[in-house]
Amino acid sequence: MPRVKAAQAGRQSSAKRHLAEQFAVGEIITDMAKKEWKVGLPIGQGGFGCIYLADMNSSESVGSDAPCVVKVEPSDNGPLFTELKFYQRAAKPEQIQKWIRTRKLKYLGVPKYWGSGLHDKNGKSYRFMIMDRFGSDLQKIYEANAKRFSRKTVLQLSLRILDILEYIHEHEYVHGDIKASNLLLNYKNPDQVYLVDYGLAYRYCPEGVHKEYKEDPKRCHDGTIEFTSIDAHNGVAPSRRGDLEILGYCMIQWLTGHLPWEDNLKDPKYVRDSKIRYRENIASLMDKCFPEKNKPGEIAKYMETVKLLDYTEKPLYENLRDILLQGLKAIGSKDDGKLDLSVVENGGLKAKTITKKRKKEIEESKEPGVEDTEWSNTQTEEAIQTRSRTRKRVQK
């Protein structure tokens, strides 16, 4: 279900935002650092903007293997401006690389920010942002897998998402909309997952001062209704505990294919009250979602831990990771970095081998097409730097 920003729903229809017109293939745009980029074929279109393949400017055309995309919107629209603020503060390549080194991670699933600026075309001003390119989103794969992921896959995904959340939380932001459609795979490494869509990311702790808990009736039920936190249902600004609560709901849905309140999403008060009732009795939530004996105890322990967090409290991310690692151990597995996106049997927790037909469908879903609305990552930071060095030698 699409994200709903309660306080903005009415404003968006009356704001008369403008649609971005098509940019020509080969058009040159210059970012704020005076770096030139060349626009390639369009691969996506959002509500008010377009997404194109992009690469550093050269005499060559932008190939299908371009490492980046450019997201373009009319400069008087708001979503891209908001998203830019997050990326400029928290997603510079050097910031991400430093975090990876100090935390000894293999990678971090936060897209890198490569540049942004304004571009005039036919008397109109457009805002653009250069980003990594990605592959298929998890929602497509989840649906192709009969709306089930194996227990190992869910735990592996969640460990990487915890890495992401810890990073953005430490940089004063919360996401507020973790869900499968906002999780994209690295185009050439399907074992790497990235969290995208920071257009409504919230700076919960500007200059180190946490926002106070305050219920605002105008903001009730912000977010994607089936996953959004109880705080958001009550009109409270997003917080770290809210992101972790949302991840808990995602884990349950990925394992079972369904959340207890999904049959009545048109009644947000019912959804909120259901979440409150189950938060007070996590055991009943587990019984409802996992009627079989083979219940994932780590999910219950995770939910119990998250529900104890105060609004302004800093989570102990390592403790949460340990809980999920114990879950992997309980099924005879370990954190090997493999997502193993395969079909599961009859709604249970046991994985089976993916069929050739299903594998082909998933592979085809990774192909960049105009219908895709998010980014895909095909090459790394090193690839971009290699291209840059090569072109400098040619120019000499």
Curated annotation (Swiss-Prot):
Effect of residue 102 to A: Does not abolish autophosphorylation
Effect on the protein upon substituting residue 355 to A: Does not abolish autophosphorylation
Effect on the protein upon substituting residue 342 to A: Abolishes phosphorylation by PLK3 and induction of Golgi fragmentation during mitosis. Strongly reduced autophosphorylation
Gene responsible for this protein: VRK1
GO process annotations (BP): Cajal body organization; cell division; chromatin remodeling; DNA damage response; Golgi disassembly; mitotic nuclear membrane disassembly; neuron projection development; positive regulation of protein localization to chromatin
Phosphoserine modification, residue list: 342, 376
Catalytic activity: L-seryl-[protein] + ATP = O-phospho-L-seryl-[protein] + ADP + H(+); L-threonyl-[protein] + ATP = O-phospho-L-threonyl-[protein] + ADP + H(+)
GO CC terms, sorted: Cajal body; chromatin; cytoplasm; cytosol; Golgi stack; nucleolus; nucleoplasm; nucleus
UniProt tissue specificity: Widely expressed. Highly expressed in fetal liver, testis and thymus.
Quaternary assembly: Interacts with HDAC1, KAT2B, SETDB1, KDM3A and KDM4A. Associates with the nucleosome through interactions with nucleosome DNA, histone H2A and histone H2B; the interaction with H2A and H2B is mediated by the nucleosome acidic patch, a cluster of negatively charged residues of H2A and H2B forming a cleft within the nucleosome core. (Microbial infection) Interacts with vaccinia protein B12; this interaction inhibits the repressive activity of the vaccinia virus B12 pseudokinase on viral replication factory formation.
Location of region: Required for interaction with the nucleosome: 387-393
Effect of residue 387 to H: In HMNR10; likely pathogenic; severely decreased interaction with nucleosome
Effect of residue 14 to A: Does not abolish autophosphorylation
Residues reported to bind ATP: 43-51, 71
Residues recorded as bearing Phosphothreonine in the entry: 355, 378
Disease cited in the entry: Pontocerebellar hypoplasia 1A: A form of pontocerebellar hypoplasia, a disorder characterized by structural defects of the pons and cerebellum, evident upon brain imaging. PCH1A is an autosomal recessive form characterized by an abnormally small cerebellum and brainstem, central and peripheral motor dysfunction from birth, gliosis and spinal cord anterior horn cells degeneration resembling infantile spinal muscular atrophy. Additional features include muscle hypotonia, congenital contractures and respiratory insufficiency that is evident at birth. Neuronopathy, distal hereditary motor, autosomal recessive 10: A form of distal hereditary motor neuronopathy, a heterogeneous group of neuromuscular diseases caused by selective degeneration of motor neurons in the anterior horn of the spinal cord, without sensory deficit in the posterior horn. HMNR10 is a slowly progressive form characterized by distal muscle weakness and atrophy predominantly affecting the lower limbs, and resulting in gait abnormalities. Upper limb involvement is seen in some patients.
Source domain of life: Eukaryota
Function: Serine/threonine kinase involved in the regulation of key cellular processes including the cell cycle, nuclear condensation, transcription regulation, and DNA damage response. Controls chromatin organization and remodeling by mediating phosphorylation of histone H3 on 'Thr-4' and histone H2AX (H2aXT4ph). It also phosphorylates KAT5 in response to DNA damage, promoting KAT5 association with chromatin and histone acetyltransferase activity. Is involved in the regulation of cell cycle progression of neural progenitors, and is required for proper cortical neuronal migration.
Signal sequence residues: none
Species this protein is from: Homo sapiens
Entry's Gene Ontology molecular function annotations: ATP binding; histone binding; histone H2AX kinase activity; histone H3S10 kinase activity; histone H3T3 kinase activity; kinase activity; nucleosomal DNA binding; protein kinase activity
KW Nucleotide-binding (keyword) present: yes
Protein name: Serine/threonine-protein kinase VRK1
